[in-house]
A protein has these predicted regions:
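Hydrophobic transmembrane alpha-helices and their immediate loop junctions
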Residues: 1-230
Length: 230
């Protein structure tokens, strides 16, 4: 199996798990705040089958991976019934925040485990350096690095969850950032915002990758440097 295929498998595994946690966080938060809609549909679960969208969760990320583009996508939106919330505005706001917050929390947990691997486990530091080099498409002989799979999963666990955290906070429908922003807009402005927001998202999706790609490599280099020096 080629190194590129191995990288893709690692990324897909992390992405699918991140999607599942993200959407189940929405569903669980909505349930706790009074709306059982997602719970009744079986969405308070880490089972990826309940959350994955064929195009957004599988085909689009694979297209991005095989074409050297962005590893990005979406899961099936978490269904909510706002009138069920004990406080509609608070319920919508906290439910929207729960998804990105779960990605940030997962990135934090992965970082903590990576630091444990680096400082407390023999061979951990070398495996982390190998994971970062492999992610940068440097060909290595990984046969002797028993901890490499763990280091690779944790590395992508940080990187992919941070990307999803930032991506989902973009204030364009249907992303979580739009639901958060809409809670602070007057009703008339909010209605207009929701109508034009989807077109804005499509434009962002088409052009945003090219624009953000300018910053991605320098930011990734800074990210890898920070991991190596922590």
């Amino acid at each position: 199996m080629s190194q590129e295929v191995v990288l893709i498998l690692f990324q897909v595994v992390v992405l699918v798990f991140a999607f599942s946690v993200h959407e189940s966080a929405h569903a669980y938060t909505a349930m706790r705040l009074g709306d059982p809609t997602a719970y009744m549909l079986g969405r308070v679960t880490l089972n990826p089958i309940k959350h994955l969208d064929l195009f957004g969760s599988v085909l689009l990320p694979l297209i991005g991976l095989f074409t050297g583009g962005w590893l990005i996508g979406w899961a099936k939106p978490c269904p909510i019934t706002p009138r069920n919330f004990r406080d509609i505005r608070r319920g919508e706001l906290l439910t929207a925040l729960a998804g990105p917050a779960s990605n940030l929390a997962m990135a934090g947990v992965a970082l903590l485990l990576l630091m444990v691997l680096k400082h407390l486990v023999p061979g951990g530091y070398v495996s982390i350096l190998a994971a970062m080099a492999t992610a940068d498409h440097v060909a290595l002989d990984l046969g002797a690095l028993r901890l490499f799979p763990i280091a690779m999963l944790l590395y992508y666990g940080i990187l992919i969850n941070l990307l999803l955290f930032v991506f989902n906070l973009v204030p364009l429908p249907p992303l979580d950032g739009s639901m958060i922003l809409s809670q602070f807009l007057p009703p008339q402005i909010d209605q207009a915002y929701r109508r034009i927001g989807l077109w804005g998202f499509l434009l962002f999706f088409i052009l945003g990758g090219r624009i953000l790609g300018i910053f991605y490599d320098p930011l990734l280099g800074a990210f890898n440097h920070a991991l190596a020096t922590l």
